Amino acid sequence: MKKIIYFGLSVLSLFLLIACSKGEEKSSQENQTSQPQQQATVKQIAVGAEAPDFTLQSMDGKEVKLSDFKGKKVYLKFWASWCGPCKKSMPELMELAAKEDRGFEILSVIAPGLQGEKTVDQFPKWFEEQGYKDIPVLYDTKGNTFQAYQIRSIPTEFLIDSNGKIAKIQLGAISNADAEAAFAQMD
């Protein structure tokens, strides 16, 4: 009698396992067919692609658009105040920003109040306390620019040529020497 019960439970378990795996397979196929439709709405961020335009408020309250820099090369850094590698790279970026003849503009973007970042009210005081200067900071308060540039890790830096095309994408901080060399090769 025990053998019949064990056999019945085994058959039932096998049946349930097969039924569940077919449901997952169907669900997986549905996701695969709907995924390209979702991806079609997201502009691909890659070297050679047009850099997505944005309009953000600077730390000093001015409206800044990337398109305002058309015809100029742009160093665009996405970072956060809580990010160790970001903070470690800031002194070198300040050196670069202090150079008047560098041949490109520097913009940095944070997302105040999102994902642990300081708020718009807290950030300027913290920035000053760190001794940071000469680095324009733009506020992406809704995270739309981070999303448009598909930022998944910080720091992430983009070197944009004078035609508004992405020339280099750097995950992690780029050295001043590498940034200057990359900009020198553009155009």
Q: Regions from the language model: what does each represent?
A:
Residues K72-K73, K88-A111, E128, N176, ...:
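Conserved helix-turn-beta segment immediately C-terminal to the redox Cys motif
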Residues M1-A51, D187:
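N-terminal targeting signals for export/organelle localization
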Residues V64-K87, I106-L107:
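Short active-site neighborhood of thiol/selenol oxidoreductases, capturing the structured segment around
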Residues Q122-I160:
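Short, internal strand/loop/helix patches
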Residues G71-V74, R102-E105, K133-I135, S162-K165:
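Loop/turn elements at helix/coil->beta-strand transitions in domains of secreted/extracellular proteins
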